[in-house]
Swiss-Prot record:
DNA-binding keyword on record: no
Domain of life: Eukaryota
UniProt-annotated glycosylation sites, renumbered to this chain: N100
Subunit structure: Homodimer; disulfide-linked. Also found as heterodimer with PGF. Interacts with NRP1. Interacts with isoform 2 of BSG. Interacts with CD82; this interaction inhibits VEGFA-mediated signaling pathway.
Keyword Disulfide bond: yes
A molecular function (GO) term: vascular endothelial growth factor receptor binding
Pfam families per record: PDGF
A GO cellular component entry from the record: membrane
Sorted UniProt keywords: Angiogenesis, Developmental protein, Differentiation, Disulfide bond, Glycoprotein, Growth factor, Heparin-binding, Mitogen, Signal
This protein's name: Vascular endothelial growth factor A
Top-level taxonomy: Eukaryota, Metazoa, Chordata, Craniata, Vertebrata
Family: Belongs to the PDGF/VEGF growth factor family.
Gene source species: Ovis aries (Sheep)
Amino acid sequence: MNFLLSWVHWSLALLLYLHHAKWSQAAPMAEGGQKPHEVMKFMDVYQRSFCRPIETLVDIFQEYPDEIEFIFKPSCVPLMRCGGCCNDESLECVPTEEFNITMQIMRIKPHQSQHIGEMSFLQHNKCECRPKKDKARQEKCDKPRR
C-alpha cells in the first residue's frame, strides 16, 4: 500500500513537472533560469532537487587518470550523472541504468603532436534512491581472514 501511494505521489509530481516545463519554454527566463525577483515555488525546488540524472561537468582526468601525458581540450565534458537529494539520510542517489557515449576530444602531447580522437564516457540514464552501503561493514568483509 505504501508503495502504491508513493508511486502515485511521484507520478503526480512528474506530471506537474512536465506541465511546468512546457510553460517554462514559452516564457523566456533570465540568465540564472528564473525571472528577476521571482520566488521559486516549493514544487519546483522539490522536483529539481530530487535524485535524477543531471548534466554535470566531469574532468577528463577523473575518468582517464592514467593518461597524464596528454592535455585534453576541452579539459572537462558534459555528462549526465546522478545527483540530487533522497530526503532520507540512509539513502543515496545511485545510477540504475548506464550507457557509454563517445565524444571527440583534442589530445595534445606537448611539443610533439595533437589530434582529435574519440573517447568514451559513462552516462547515467536512470537514478534511484537506494540504501547506503555500510562502509565499516564492507571494509570488515573485504579484510582477509586468518
